[in-house]
């Protein structure tokens, strides 16, 4: 994967997250902000999830209250380099915990 393809894929990931949160109809107030290569999800309780790009490594990094995760693209899925879990699974787990209700991105 070259840098241009990495940015295209990361942009698509950011757009999907933003669209899902724009359509969020849960009770919790969840906001999403993109600034440069960083996407910040903010919750009512003041907690945040930070997602950023690591261009030199062609990785997406996810920072949550539960910890930090690094994802490599394998096939068409972003996979955690430690646990083997998908980006979407870990993001949903963290967002659900931080929102206090089920949050789905798929």
UniProtKB/Swiss-Prot annotation:
Described purpose of this protein according to its UniProt entry: Involved in iron-sulfur (Fe-S) cluster assembly. May act as a regulator of Fe-S biogenesis.
Domain of life: Bacteria
Protein species of origin: Salmonella heidelberg (strain SL476)
Name of this chain's protein: Iron-sulfur cluster assembly protein CyaY
UniProt-listed Pfam families: Frataxin_Cyay (PF01491)
Matching InterPro entries: CyaY, Frataxin/CyaY, Frataxin/CyaY_sf, Frataxin_CS
Lineage of source species: Bacteria, Pseudomonadati, Pseudomonadota, Gammaproteobacteria, Enterobacterales
UniProt xrefs under SMART domains: Frataxin_Cyay
The family this protein is said to belong to: Belongs to the frataxin family.
Gene this chain is encoded by: cyaY
GO cellular component terms attached to this protein's record: cytosol
Keyword Iron-sulfur: no
Signal peptide: none
Alphabetized SUPFAM superfamilies for the sequence: Frataxin/Nqo15-like (SSF55387)
Keyword Iron on entry: yes
